Amino acid sequence: MDQHTLDVEDTADARHPAGTSCPSDAALLRDTGLLADAALLSDTVRPTNAALPTDAAYPAVNVRDREAAWPPALNFCSRHPKLYGLVALVLLLLIAACVPIFTRTEPRPALTITTSPNLGTRENNADQVTPVSHIGCPNTTQQGSPVFAKLLAKNQASLCNTTLNWHSQDGAGSSYLSQGLRYEEDKKELVVDSPGLYYVFLELKLSPTFTNTGHKVQGWVSLVLQAKPQVDDFDNLALTVELFPCSMENKLVDRSWSQLLLLKAGHRLSVGLRAYLHGAQDAYRDWELSYPNTTSFGLFLVKPDNPWE
């Protein structure tokens, strides 16, 4: 090695004495005032060893330690909390405004009540003819009035075999007799003038008397419907009530019977009372027809018999 080469090496050693190294990038950044970035780079700079000629001759190399913790990432939310709060508030307002739109229902129509026209402005219908139905319960005569009768037992309390007499005048209790029917009191018969299908009913009401104290009387009491002429296909037109010794504990014993009968014009109907009681002397005096809950007999027209139909 010549003398010139030795002089050059001595000059290099004189500028970089032993134990020193070239200033790192971290030192330069620290001198310029970027402290945070200098600290970051200082963690990643491999330490130099001035004793080694290679370290003194070449600049330091940044090497990341795999086991060292990475610096925390920059959190955008932490830097802008007010912006995120404003966005959340706007979303809540939008949701509150949309809820009524999707939950809106159609209003229910108002209830409409149809009332009858004012009587003062009613039209004159005197010249119009209203048709009368021929099927109903009860039905009507040609004049439009219902054919109906209800007769109440008259002047009869004791139980004996007889034909009952009836109240037929309006106002006598609940008795009623319409057109198309008439009652002949002397014969005790109800006469049918309007032919057709009739609903006929009987109601028998009995009460114990004050002499019925022995609890021994028993038997039966009947109401028998009698028709002139006889009604076809009906053999049993009777209402029967059975009485027992214990029956006197009831203040009222009542039974009813009904039947649809086809009656012709001129048919005559009457009701017979039949009784059979035994078990004590004068047993027939222990029971009587009730009053004011009165035994009744009646009928009404269901369907008229019109030959031209």
From Swiss-Prot:
Residue ranges, annotated region (Disordered): 1-20
THD domain span: 147-302
Residue stretches of biased makeup (Basic and acidic residues): 1-16
Membrane topology: Single-pass type II membrane protein
Superkingdom, natural source: Eukaryota
Gene3D superfamilies: 2.60.120.40
Transmembrane segments: 83-103
UniProt-listed GO biological process terms: immune response; myeloid dendritic cell differentiation; positive regulation of activated T cell proliferation; positive regulation of cytotoxic T cell differentiation; positive regulation of interleukin-12 production; positive regulation of interleukin-6 production; positive regulation of type II interferon production; regulation of immature T cell proliferation in thymus
Residues of this chain annotated as glycosylated in UniProt: N139, N161, N293
Location relative to the cell: Membrane
GO cellular component: extracellular space; plasma membrane
The entry's keywords: Cytokine, Glycoprotein, Membrane, Signal-anchor, Transmembrane, Transmembrane helix
Extracellular side, ranges: 104-309
Entry's Gene Ontology molecular function annotations: cytokine activity; signaling receptor binding; tumor necrosis factor receptor binding; tumor necrosis factor receptor superfamily binding
Main location: membrane
Cytoplasmic membrane side: 1-82
Subunit structure: Homotrimer.
Task performed by this protein: Cytokine that binds to TNFRSF9. Induces the proliferation of activated peripheral blood T-cells. May have a role in activation-induced cell death (AICD). May play a role in cognate interactions between T-cells and B-cells/macrophages.
Protein family (similarity comment): Belongs to the tumor necrosis factor family.
Name listed for the protein in its UniProt record: Tumor necrosis factor ligand superfamily member 9
GN (gene name): Tnfsf9
